[in-house]
Regions:
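Active-site segments of SGNH/GDSL-like serine hydrolases
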Residues: 43-49, 69-103
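Aromatic-residue-lined binding/catalytic grooves and analogous aromatic/hydrophobic interfacial grooves
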Residues: 163-595, 602, 613-615, 635, ...
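Conserved SGNH/GDSL esterase-like catalytic core that processes O-acyl groups on lipids
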Residues: 1-65, 91, 99
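Well-ordered alpha-helical segments within folded domains of soluble proteins
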Residues: 530-540, 601-612, 681-691, 746-755, ...
């Protein structure tokens, strides 16, 4: 706007004339007057909250009026804006946000009202970014300063500032449109999702809805399966695993439904295409192209110029209005011209509903005589501009000469909405179109930030990468360090969780929420031999506890089917419920059709570990009482079906397999064998399940006799075994693996995510795990590398964990060969198996938090596996078991200050941090010991200072 801007701030000064450092007595204040401003923004009051200054609060309004009088007396007659101070807290400086909110801000508002001066609410503007965009709890960093500047600009000019990419650890950004789907940016509200490619001439936006599932409920129960069980077990007892496996292939498999497609698959919703026209600028070369995803707001942008026109596109999925929004605008009136259409590769039709409204509708193949899942996606357009022309035919909507346009899309399926899915989608769209869409975007940001801003991490920024796009940073990361890329990855993981699931919806599947085809890899289902569990590893520690609830609901729905599968496959004596290695929205619990991978029967036990984990963080006894019957039912299955193996008399699962892995029997036969009894992972899961059920029964004061029976059974389980070469054994016998670098490392479940093995409690087993991991190697699929990050973090080896993280971020393809995908990470930070699988992202997110904070062994462990290159950093809002929240600042690899906010468990302890000589708890020295016990009430904050 061609204004000269002057900043006449002086740090630590007060508005109060009686304060310790009065601003109006400084030379900077006189310089501000001499500047003869046309516009003045006054932001004072933060330092007036200090005790020595707040005692003079009776004169605060008088001093503010005096300051205003001095500016109004100037010959320039400036417009004056009063700013509300930003959120600030710093105990040792005496700065108190409670006084700012309840004392200083009301005074400023009173003066503004008395003098009819406008107020700029910087406190509200910065509150979502406190403390993550602050240097020290009082002073904002450069990104916080940018938000203040944007807020001032908007309030003074009445215009939205031109958006630009933000923080390097909260922004994915690119300087060209996406060339393939794995370069597009994911958005979602927990049910609806979209992925725009940012195309300039033709733009492709893939639409998603979490319940777009083909298939239907079906009977997979094989009535003859349990008849073969005694013979299968006899063969296993005699070491004839090959014969047992062959028998299972013919008998211990699910019954095939009459029509084979009932299992179904998660599918895309559809495609939205925009064909943009640029009029006289059609031949102008696009310039200043940027597209990015702002994790701090949950919004994506595309910006570029053509000729003298600057174009801005904004993409957001609103949770409150339950719609997808695309906002197109330009700085020159009448510059928005496009044609929009909807389509789907199969089983989709398009029709005009009304002027400015198109519907994509259809049904997904049930594979049976049951009703298909039906869906409706309805797009509506509203425009602004005096010369706007808008027309709708049966296939498209055309907009010409608009100043700005909003595309609003709603979608519903009969799976979640029932028979009213179509009318409900139309109602939601109409309600959204009637609303103030700018306010809808603001509401969407606040709704998202209510979750996202609970926690975050900061790691050292490298100025050398500030100008690099995200894909360039990924490539550079293999040769040169970039710690803030790990912070970006962690923040992105939390973003993906918030975007892909919410209470009342479905849990994220193998694709999370996002798919670009009707036939997703592995059906886009819920693999229960690690994948759906890995999806949820970071949820609790990332302070997103309620995002567990869709998984809890899924498990509840599986129980009746699991009870039927238990009796059909394991005999009438089988109690409780069972789940094998995969499931879907149709409650599939039977074994897989190939026993080599489908015989694993501990999927339910592993999911119960997550049910228990949610209790450990929440402490909700009503929740525990609700899920206890599920956990008990899972334990009853194993208690009633496990058998004594003949060699040691141990209780084992049989038949089963170690997930997807195989071995060779002794001798010359090189037939890969998967079917076995009592693999290490099964025993770890059963031991954990029994232990958790016992603990839950004690808490709930129920089933004492059954708990005692489980305790006795625990004593009959096989112990962990170490091979002659020092590895943790994967099977009861020290078999030779068919692939020593196999992607699954299932027998280390007890190290992570379980807690039966640790460096402190079981050092010999921990060392065996270390040797096992070295033998397995650091390569593997994307999600396998992610799991190994967690293993090494649990072993306390931060540098090795970080090495695995860098391996996880290996570029999935090169510019020279973009269609050949390998393991690693795509340009949009999606994990590549290959192909894309979302579990690797959340496994990596979990691994980063495990490097910074652990609590699985009954104590808080700060920086348990800190890499050398993360010497300085901070995190806030991370949760530990017991419900406490931890904020931490560290320098030179050692913690400096930790603030702990109490949860449901009051008595906690912390491991004495490595390299620390003295610890102060609320200014009182702690006794030097291996652990620091302390008490903190729920909601109470205590501070540790480390020296």
């Amino acid at each position: 706007n061609n204004y000269e801007v002057g900043n006449f701030d002086v740090t630590a000064h007060t508005l109060s004339q009686k304060g310790d450092l009065p601003y109006m007595k400084t030379t900077r204040f006189q310089e501000a007057l001499d500047f003869l401003p046309n516009i003045v923004t006054i932001k004072l009051g933060t330092n007036d909250s200090k005790p020595q200054n707040w005692q003079h609060r009776a004169t605060f309004k008088d001093d503010l009026n005096l300051l205003i009088d001095k500016f109004q007396a100037l010959a320039s007659h400036p417009h004056i804006y009063l700013c509300l101070p930003i959120p600030s807290n710093r105990k040792e400086w005496g700065i108190n946000d409670s006084i700012i909110v309840n004392g200083i801000i009301p005074y400023i508002r009173e003066v503004a009202a008395e003098r009819s001066l406008p107020v700029i609410d910087l406190h509200t503007a910065m509150l979502p970014y406190y403390p993550q965009l602050y240097v020290d709890g009082v002073h904002p960093d450069k990104y916080g300063a940018a938000i203040i500047a944007e807020t001032l600009y908007k309030c003074i000019t009445g215009e939205e500032p031109h958006p630009t990419p933000g923080r390097s650890d909260q922004t994915l950004w690119y300087d060209e449109p996406a060339a393939q789907w794995e370069e597009t940016l994911p958005l979602g509200n927990g049910r609806l999702g979209m992925m725009p490619d940012g195309g300039i001439g033709k733009e492709h936006i893939v639409l998603n809805e979490i319940s777009m599932w083909s298939g239907s409920e079906a009977n997979y129960l094989n009535p003859d399966a349990s008849k073969s069980l005694p013979e299968i077990r006899r063969l296993l007892f005699e070491g004839k695993n090959k014969e047992a496996q062959e028998l299972m292939y013919t008998s211990f498999v699910p019954k095939k439904p009459e029509k084979g497609g009932t299992y179904g698959a998660f599918q895309m919703l559809g495609d939205l295409f925009l064909e943009h026209q640029y009029g006289v600028h059609e031949k102008d070369v696009p310039a200043d192209y940027h597209r990015w995803l702002d994790l701090s707001k949950g919004i994506a942008y595309t910006t570029f110029s053509r000729g003298n026109v600057n174009y801005v596109r904004e993409y957001v999925v609103s949770r409150d209005k339950d719609v997808m929004l695309i906002h197109l605008k330009a700085n020159v009136p009448g510059s928005i011209n496009f044609k929009m259409n909807l389509s789907r590769p199969e089983r989709g039709s398009v029709r005009k509903l009304a002027e400015g409204k198109l519907e994509l509708y259809g049904s997904l193949d049930s594979g049976s005589s049951q009703t298909d899942v039906r869906y409706a996606a309805i797009a509506g357009i509203t425009c602004k501009g005096r010369q706007t022309n808008q027309s709708t035919d049966e296939q498209s909507i055309t907009v010409q000469n608009a100043d700005e346009a909003w595309i609003v899309v709603s979608a519903k399926t009969s799976f979640l909405a029932g028979e009213i899915y179509e009318t409900e989608a139309d109602r939601i769209l109409n309600d959204a179109l009637k609303s103030n869409l700018c306010e809808t975007v603001s509401e969407a940001i606040l709704s998202y930030q209510a979750l996202f801003n609970r926690a975050g991490i900061r790691l050292p920024e490298n100025e050398a990468v500030s100008h690099l796009t995200t894909d360039q940073r990924i490539e550079r990361f293999q040769q040169q360090d970039d710690p803030s890329l790990a912070a970006l990855y962690y923040n992105y993981g939390r973003y993906l969780l918030i975007s892909s699931t919410r209470p009342g919806s479905l849990p994220p599947n193998l694709q999370g929420l996002w798919a670009n085809e009707p036939g997703t890899p592995w059906n886009g289902d819920y693999h229960t031999n690690i994948n759906v569990q890995m999806n949820h590893w970071p949820v609790e520690q990332a302070n997103l506890s309620e995002l567990y609830l869709p998984l809890v609901d899924l498990v509840k729905r599986l129980v009746p089917s699991g009870e039927e599968s238990a009796k059909a496959f394991y005999g009438p004596q089988a109690k409780g419920w069972v789940l094998h290695m995969m499931t879907n929205v149709w409650n599939y619990t039977a074994p897989g059709e190939h026993p080599s991978w489908g015989a694993t029967n501990t999927g339910g036990a592993w999911l119960c570990a997550h049910l228990w984990e949610h209790y450990l963080f929440s402490g909700d006894r009503n929740y525990l009482a609700d899920i206890y019957p599920i956990m008990k039912g899972a334990s009853e299955f194993f208690y009633s079906t496990m058998v004594r193996e003949p060699k040691h008399g141990w209780l084992v699962t049989a038949p089963t397999s170690s997930p997807e892995n195989a071995f060779y029997l002794p001798g010359k036969d090189r037939t890969p064998i998967s079917v076995c009894m009592g693999p290490t992972m099964d025993i770890q899961l059963v031991r954990e399940l029994y232990t958790n059920v016992i603990e839950a029964s004690h808490i709930l004061h129920t089933d004492t006799a059954y708990a005692e029976a489980l305790q006795e059974a625990i004593g009959l389980l096989p112990p962990h075994q170490i091979s002659k070469k020092g590895y943790l054994m994967e099977w009861l016998e020290d078999y030779e693996e068919t692939d020593i670098h196999h992607r699954h490392v299932s027998h280390l479940y007890g190290l992570h995510p379980g807690n039966q093995i640790s460096v402190l409690k079981t050092p010999e087993l921990a060392e065996a795990c270390r040797k096992t991991l070295n033998r397995r190697g650091d390569e593997g699929t994307g999600w396998s590398r992610a799991w190994k990050i967690n293993f090494w973090a649990r072993l306390g080896d931060g540098n090795r964990a970080y090495k695995l993280f860098r391996s996880l971020l290996y570029p999935a393809y090169t510019a020279q060969n973009p269609t050949q995908h390998g393991s690693g990470t795509f340009p949009n930070l999606f994990c590549s198996h290959p192909p894309f699988q979302m579990d690797g992202n959340w496994g990596g997110t979990s691994g980063i938090s495990e490097m910074l904070l652990q609590s699985q062994d009954g104590f808080i462990h700060l920086l348990p596996a800190l890499p050398e290159s993360w010497k300085d950093g901070s995190f806030y809002g991370l949760k530990v078991r017991g419900g406490a929240t931890v904020d931490l600042v560290w320098k030179d690899g050692k913690p400096v200050q930790a603030t702990i906010t109490g949860g449901w468990q009051n008595n906690l302890k912390m491991k004495w941090p490595k390299g620390v000589k003295k610890v102060l708890l609320n200014d009182t020295a702690c006794r030097t010991d291996s652990f620091i016990p302390f008490t903190v009430k729920q909601g109470e904050c205590i501070t540790f200072i480390f020296e």
